[in-house]
Amino acid sequence: MSQVEFEMACASLKQLKGPVSDQEKLLVYSFYKQATQGDCNIPVPPATDVRAKAKYEAWMVNKGMSKMDAMRIYIAKVEELKKKEPC
């Protein structure tokens, strides 16, 4: 697993044409943030900003995970989503 593989997975995700659920988007987002920035380091968003709050909470779940582990999981999740793509 390398930085190049991670970047390729990031590019692949942008090319997906099939539907991706909000839950899947949040999960992939959380691993992307952990892989690129490490533990969540932003203030808690206001409860009124539902989207930002959901993203924050998803990222916080990965607290303590190494960037390399997050990259591996991100790549695996993107591969799962690619397999769901319509032919």
Curated annotation (Swiss-Prot):
Listed SUPFAM superfamilies: Acyl-CoA binding protein
Known tissue expression: Exclusively expressed in late spermatids and spermatozoa. Not found in epididymis, spleen, bone marrow, skin, liver, brain, heart, kidney, muscle.
Alphabetical UniProt keywords: Cytoplasm, Lipid-binding, Transport
Molecular function in Gene Ontology: fatty-acyl-CoA binding
Claim: Cell division is one of the keywords in the record: no
UniProt keyword Transport present: yes
UniProt binding sites for an acyl-CoA: 29-33, 55, 74
Gene Ontology cellular component list: cytoplasm
CDD domains: ACBP
Protein task: May be involved in the energy metabolism of the mature sperm.
PANTHER family noted in UniProt: ACYL-COA-BINDING PROTEIN, ACBP, DIAZEPAM-BINDING INHIBITOR-LIKE 5
The name this protein goes by in its record: Diazepam-binding inhibitor-like 5
